[in-house]
Amino acid sequence: MKNIFTFLLLVFIGGQFLWGQPANLVWNIQSRNASESMPCGGGDIGMNVWVENDDVLFYLSRSGSFDENNCLLKQGRFRVRLTPNPFAGTASFRQTLHLNDGYVSVSSDNATLIIWVDVFHPVVHVEVKTKELTSMRVNFESWRYEDR
């Protein structure tokens, strides 16, 4: 009887674990601003990723980056712009946070952009796959322009 109870308990707990796996978070429209960003990161690098006005943007932070008030700061914002832009005016826009694999993908009919962080090195990877020749421009936008 004790073995049957233990077996049923393990089956129940295992079933709850399998059913309890989080699903990927999917957005079908672009964000209005950074308050609608998706978190992503690995190691000591953290990001907030979103798509605004057809540009892919992300804030970058690193553990240990504190200001004079002991607040954790973002290092700045990166803006990724593709030309011609495959996310402009498309009804097939999709931004997905892949929870089990730890990356964010932005896709449309013509392209897929993947952002992920190497957990062993402080490196952010931005991969772009498109059906047509596309140029990518990445800008760093810092709001810390003077010492405090």
PLM features: residue spans?
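Beta-sandwich/jelly-roll carbohydrate-recognition scaffolds of carbohydrate-active enzymes
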Residues: 21-148
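Sec-dependent N-terminal signal peptides
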Residues: 4-15
